[in-house]
């Protein structure tokens, strides 16, 4: 399949303006900065800050960018656009989507994996003629995930399950000969997509997420604010706000 331009993705997916703007911003950052594991985060931050001065800190142990979009803008569709762009333009094949609760987790599973679902986000995109392989927090222990190296994979996890399962995820998995956490941390191209990321900035889950050593983090939230004691602290890694 060809490399899909942001115009092409926006057209096929009928993206709304804020979704399209977000995709273009990701493209500009990915084209300006050589994103790789172990890169100099300070230099990368300087590059992002020069393009989007609102971003002053990645706030994590890896490059993480927040797109602050009002509720109802269609964040799942935007995730699909991010995935399509990173897959076809940058050859990224491993995506780890974190959901803040069971309801959103179930919705993400359907919207990202079920072509018969009217809200299936990859409809019409030739690169997903065969739907991407989905690995969920219900089946990561049993699935022989290492057998699907060639395909694009989307791991979908509920943050609460992630917190509870963390000890299991650190146990050796007979299929992969490593713990699931180690397996993910060793992937060269893991992109973390955090839905409603304001929910789990303070939780220990964030430490667990840092330990996955992703290549890149993309955060989507309508409320880019953390409550710290009686104060409300704004996210420092926002690159786009709508409205």
Label for each model-derived stretch:
Residues 119-174:
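Inter-Walker segment of RecA-like/P-loop motor cores
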Residues 84, 88, 102, 109-110, ...:
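Signature of the SF2 helicase/ATPase Hel1-core->accessory helical subdomain module
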Residues 31, 58-61, 75, 114, ...:
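ASCE P-loop NTPase motor core, strongest for the SF2 helicase catalytic module
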Residues 71-73:
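The conserved Walker
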Residues 1-68:
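Conserved pre-motif I regulatory segment
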Residues 91-123:
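Conserved Walker A/P-loop ATP-binding site and its immediately adjacent core
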Residues 75-85:
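Motif I (Walker A/P-loop) of helicase-class P-loop NTPases
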Residues 8-9, 81-83, 134-147, 176-179, ...:
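Short alpha-helical segments and helix-capping/turn motifs at coil-helix boundaries
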């Amino acid at each position: 399949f060809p490399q899909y331009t942001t115009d092409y993705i926006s057209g096929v997916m009928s993206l709304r303006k804020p979704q399209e703007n977000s995709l273009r911003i990701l493209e500009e950052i990915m084209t300006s900065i050589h994103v790789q594991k172990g890169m100099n985060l300070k230099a990368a931050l300087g590059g992002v800050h020069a393009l989007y001065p609102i971003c002053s800190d990645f706030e994590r142990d890896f490059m993480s960018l927040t797109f602050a979009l009002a509720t109802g803008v269609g964040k799942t569709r935007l995730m699909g656009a991010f995935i399509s762009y990173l897959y076809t333009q940058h050859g990224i094949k491993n995506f780890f989507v974190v959901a803040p609760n069971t309801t959103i987790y179930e919705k993400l599973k359907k919207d990202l994996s079920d072509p018969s679902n009217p809200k299936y986000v990859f409809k019409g995109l030739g690169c997903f003629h065969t739907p991407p392989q989905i690995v969920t927090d219900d089946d990561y222990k049993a699935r022989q995930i290492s057998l699907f190296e060639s395909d694009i994979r989307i791991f979908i996890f509920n943050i609460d399950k992630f917190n509870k399962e963390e000890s299991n995820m650190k146990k050796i998995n007979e299929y992969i000969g490593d713990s699931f956490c180690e397996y993910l941390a060793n992937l060269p191209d893991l992109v973390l997509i955090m839905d409603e990321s304001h929910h789990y900035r303070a939780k220990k889950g964030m430490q667990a997420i840092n330990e996955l050593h992703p290549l890149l983090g993309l955060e989507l939230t309508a409320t880019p604010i953390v409550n710290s004691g009686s104060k409300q602290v704004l996210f420092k890694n926002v690159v786009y706000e709508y409205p």
